[in-house]
Design a protein with these regions (language model features):
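Conserved alpha/beta-domain cores
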Residues: 1-175
Length: 175
C-alpha cells in the first residue's frame, strides 16, 4: 500500500500517536503533511519505501529471517525464505534494496550458526520492469507477476473503476 495509508489523518489520531512516541503534535503533524502525495498509487510504495527508508527493508528482513531461523531451530524444518521486493521499475532499485536485505539476512544467519539459504526476488508489476525483465533477472532469483498494477499502469485504467469500462469495451470488441 502507499505510505499515506499507514499514517494518521485526523488531529486526534496524530495527537495520540505523538503522545505515544514522545514527540510534539506539531512535529508529527508536519511530518505527516510532508509525506502527503497527490497520486499515492504512483508514489511512495513498494521498493521506493525501501530506497527512501532502508530501515524498513532491514526490519522486514529481520522479521522474515528471524521467523525462518525459529522454524529451523524449533521445528527442524529447513526452509528457504523467499524475500520479494515489490514494485521494482529499474534494476538499480532492486540492486540497492537487495544489498540492504542481504546485509541484514547474512548477519542474522551468521549469528544463528545455521547454514540457511534464502532468495531475493521481485514482483514484476510495472511496464518498465516488464520491458527490462532481462536486466532485472540478473539480480532477481525469482519473479512474481503483479498483474493488477501491471494492467492498471499499462492500460491507464483504475483497477477500482475498470469494471464498468471493460464490459463496454468487451461488448464493442475493443478489447
Amino acid at each position: 500500500p502507499p505510505l499515506h495509508e499507514f499514517l494518521p489523518h485526523e488531529d486526534d489520531e496524530i495527537k495520540e500517536l505523538a503522545d505515544e512516541m514522545g514527540v510534539s503534535f506539531d512535529k508529527l503533524k508536519g511530518k505527516v503533511e510532508s509525506l502527503h502525495e497527490f497520486n499515492p498509487m504512483l508514489g511512495t510504495r513498494g521498493c521506493r519505501l525501501d530506497v527512501l527508508y532502508p530501515e524498513i527493508a532491514e526490519m522486514q528482513t529481520e522479521a522474515i529471517v528471524s521467523a525462518a531461523i525459529n522454524v529451523w531451530k524449533e521445528d527442524d524444518l529447513h526452509i528457504t525464505p523467499e524475500i520479494m521486493v515489490p514494485l521494482v521499475s529499474e534494476v538499480n532499485e532492486l540492486r540497492f534494496v537487495k544489498k540492504v536485505i542481504k546485509a541484514k539476512a547474512d548477519e542474522l544467519i551468521e549469528q544463528s550458526g545455521l547454514k540457511m539459504k534464502y532468495m531475493v526476488g521481485t514482483m514484476i508489476e510495472t511496464p518498465r520492469a516488464a520491458v527490462t525483465a532481462g536486466d532485472v533477472a540478473k539480480e532477481a532469483e525469482f519473479f512474481s507477476f503483479g498483474t493488477n498494477d501491471l494492467t492498471q499502469m499499462t492500460y491507464g485504467f483504475s483497477r477500482d473503476d475498470v469494471g464498468r469500462i471493460l464490459e463496454t469495451y468487451f461488448d464493442k470488441k475493443i478489447l
